[in-house]
């Protein structure tokens, strides 16, 4: 069999970004050695707040072109709270990437692992395993500052727009049901919940209408709906009852962080932003400049994002060995928590970034 070479545009970024992305790359390299004919070329690209301070640009010249030509994009963390543009907003080229590469499907897995902090006392909390599927190119983020689309924006009034289109929403809901089908094959619930505010906003009513039109195309998947305020309650009361939850941009932004809190913290929050032709993968947490350079960051969100990237590449490039490598990584993390061998500082543990990385490398079989 000819070796498969995958090209990944790699943005280490700011703060803890370079540290956690190097941890993930080490783990992916080790897993790749364990499977046949899988090679990954990591094309490093400068971007972010630190780069902006030096150059006045948020991405190096040709950086976006390199990203567009890569098989996938892997990002550490971008932005520093002390570095802002003249309009007061942070440096966030990754928000621009969402639109440029049409990354409409934001996949945010939430899974409970043994020996991690459980915020809920109910014994069912150990069963938490759901995905927040967040639309990433429109919704209320349509007028995010990076896009400069506000029609009214002055010192007395600012008007933002929640934009929902049939084209994007149809693709998103189809993505949700297909994701639920894949998860059902792995023993998950096989259920999609549309989370919206259809009783108040016309845009949200359209979001739900399209969901109801599509659900009959997937008779093997259970479909239901829930208002977003009720879902905030349900995620605290019974999050184990959910599988795939599909929602507008700002709702997903908020509820995915709530989900991260349920299973320990944002150090476990992986993220994939996927379109029809491109995929960007990154931890959902920020750059955490307060622990930058202290070897305290939890690299697991980035490692899990890297595993998700491998699954994406397996489908995109018809590369089953990438799926094998992803499974190796996931099994190593599962085993590590089951044996209490992974104890991040974030959870009150005693293991540094490098120690967690080394432990996972040892667990890869």
What is the predicted role of each segment?
Residues 9-26, 30-35, 152-228:
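Glycine-rich phosphate/diphosphate-binding loop of Rossmann-like nucleotide-binding domains
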Residues 115, 226-233:
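Short acidic loop-to-helix transition motifs that present clustered carboxylates
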């Amino acid at each position: 069999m000819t070796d498969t070479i995958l090209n990944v545009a790699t943005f280490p970024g700011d703060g803890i970004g370079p540290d956690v992305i190097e941890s993930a790359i080490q783990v992916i390299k080790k897993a790749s050695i364990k499977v046949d004919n899988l090679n990954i070329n990591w094309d490093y690209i400068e971007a972010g707040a630190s780069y902006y301070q030096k150059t006045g640009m948020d991405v190096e010249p040709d950086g976006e072109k390199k990203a567009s030509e890569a098989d996938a994009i892997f990002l550490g963390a971008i932005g520093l709270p002390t570095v802002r543009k003249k309009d007061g907003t942070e440096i966030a080229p990754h928000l621009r990437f969402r639109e440029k590469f049409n990354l409409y499907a934001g996949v945010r897995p939430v899974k409970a692992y043994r020996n991690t902090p459980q915020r809920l006392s109910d014994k069912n909390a150990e069963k938490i395993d759901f995905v927040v599927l967040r639309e990433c190119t429109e919704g209320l983020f349509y007028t995010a500052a990076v896009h400069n689309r506000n029609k009214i924006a002055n010192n007395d009034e600012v008007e933002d727009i929640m934009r929902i289109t049939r084209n994007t929403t149809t693709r998103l809901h189809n993505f949700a049901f297909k994701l639920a089908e894949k998860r059902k094959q792995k023993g998950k619930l096989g259920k999609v919940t549309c989370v919206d505010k259809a009783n108040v906003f016309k845009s949200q009513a359209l979001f739900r209408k399209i969901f109801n039109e599509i659900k009959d195309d997937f008779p093997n998947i259970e479909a239901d709906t829930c208002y977003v305020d009720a879902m905030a309650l349900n995620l605290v009361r019974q999050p184990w009852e959910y599988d795939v939850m599909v929602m507008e941009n700002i709702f997903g932004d908020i509820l995915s962080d709530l989900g991260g809190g349920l299973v320990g913290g944002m150090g476990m929050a992986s993220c994939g932003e996927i379109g029809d032709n491109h995929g960007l993968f990154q931890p959902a947490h920020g750059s955490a400049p307060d622990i930058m350079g202290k070897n305290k960051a939890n690299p697991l969100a980035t490692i899990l994002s890297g595993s998700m990237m491998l699954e994406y590449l397996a489908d995109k490039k018809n590369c089953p060995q990438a799926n094998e490598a992803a499974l190796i990584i996931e099994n190593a993390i599962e085993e590590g928590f089951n044996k209490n061998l992974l104890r991040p500082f974030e959870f009150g543990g005693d293991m540094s970034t490098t120690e967690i990385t080394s432990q996972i490398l040892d667990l890869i079989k």
